[in-house]
Amino acid sequence: VIEIGNAWNPGEPTYSTLPLETLLAFKNQCGLYLCQEFIYYNPARLPGPIEWVNKQRVRVKDSFTQIWWMSKTPHPYANNRNVAEPYSRQMKKLLSSGKYNSGTRPSEHTISQTAFSIDNGGAIPSNVIIAANTTSNDIYITKCKEHKLPIHPARMAPAIPEFFINFLT
């Protein structure tokens, strides 16, 4: 699992393709399979790049990065039950009533009458991980201060490794 932050081309308000090129190089040169792409959305991320977002106001805030899950095999171990989220109020109501509007959808998917009648203990999460990285006094910062070490300005939100450790082990 790798997260490569977004990159902007120097001196212009355009995205660099370097993160995508890096992904493809890892995949092709190492013989890896791209299992799934995730989006890490940080609602607390500061506006940037400053020149294009705040000063010239020709771009919007860059608030997400891609996380790529790669593997040496097309079928690596994973279990989405380990990262199930609480059911929504509507899903809980549906499970208790046992009634669902079954039939063919505009998408041409056919939903059976019992499709959503099984309580699986939680909802399958999406591939968008929303996590602010606003911790100002965690053990990392405490230890850095204690040992007079510089604090890295772009630390990963703890929710990211926690999700993948639970999902993939």
Provide a role label for each language-model segment.
Residues V1-T169:
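Core catalytic lobe of class I
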